[in-house]
Amino acid sequence: MNQMLAFIRLLRLPNLVIVFLTQFVPYWFALRPAILRANGIPVLSGRTFGLIAAATVLTTLAGYVLNDYYDRDIDAINRPDRRMWGRYLPAPMALTVYSGLVIVVHGLAFLIDRELRPSNHWPLWVYPAVSFLLFLYAWQLKCTAVVGNFLVSALCGVVPILLLLPEERPIWLTSFIQPDEVHRAVALVWLYGIFAFLTNLLREQVKDLEDFPGDAACGCMTLAVLKGPRFAKKPAGFTALTVSIMIGTLLIFWQQTGAPDWQIIAGAFLLLLPSLFATVAIYRAQVKKDFSRASVLIKIIMFTGVFLLLRSWPDNPMDVVTSFKAFIAAL
């Protein structure tokens, strides 16, 4: 693997796509249409949304780079063929890349704040705060029993909810005109946040079990290292069961509220079944390969959930194209 391929792999493009879609789908298919239907005027233009999405994605990427840098000794044991820093790319370069990304993100935060004036200047404190917390996670908290997992999962849950900040006033004004529709859209954004939190928490718990050998060898005090994998499987299995119950409840709600049949069927096969299989796989897992299978199922849930959670998804597929065109036109 040459340096260029190593750098591309370092980007974790599938994960970054999920981060982008977690903001794009609920905003452009739920929150923004609800505001417009209530004769409101959304604050975010396509350009401003693009800046927010770019800042969010680059903040995530900066976290990945720093996390891989601090994990290079652990990765040398757990996944030696996938270790980038110190093997395919010089380790000091990681700090340079990370610093460059953080500078770009902070520059984007100033641009966003300028676009949104007058505002409460939330971009000027949200992005620096998230960058600091991700640094703290990679540097220290990742190797803690519980705190690290909850912190990074909470930050993932904030990704879709972040877009409620600039639209706070339009949401408040339109809630007097069409309260039910606007409140449903806001609730859907929160649902995305809760789903992102739970699925990422599950992914982090399973990853700790999967990475147990390297974590133990390098003194990383995760729950699996402190209490043993057999004990650590219990909270991971409980989280998986919670996700399964949440998805099952949503399927019942969709059925009772007239959701399209294809959405219910797709939700059953692409969300509920993988979550149930993941729950069973975690409780039965004995070796690393078993946890890796559960991790794949969780990624399927995370990706398909971005689309299937959207209760107001258009019945006509061409409406999706129309929404994308509206986004491009608003840039």
Task: Please describe what each predicted stretch is.
Residues 1-18, 114, 139, 157-160, ...:
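C-terminal membrane-associated helical module and adjoining short loops/tails
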Residues 5-9, 82-176:
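Intramembrane alpha-helical segments
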Residues 53-54, 72-127, 219-257:
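Multi-pass membrane catalytic core of lipid/isoprenoid biosynthesis enzymes
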Residues 34-35, 72-79, 168-175:
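Peri-membrane helix termini and adjoining interfacial loops of integral membrane proteins
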Residues 20-70, 105-106, 121-135, 180-205:
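Membrane-embedded alpha-helical segments that form the functional core of polytopic membrane enzymes
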Residues 68, 73, 132-147, 208, ...:
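C-terminal ends of transmembrane helices
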Residues 25, 29, 33, 66, ...:
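Alpha-helical membrane-inserting segments
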Residues 14, 18, 22, 43, ...:
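Alpha-helical transmembrane segments of integral membrane proteins
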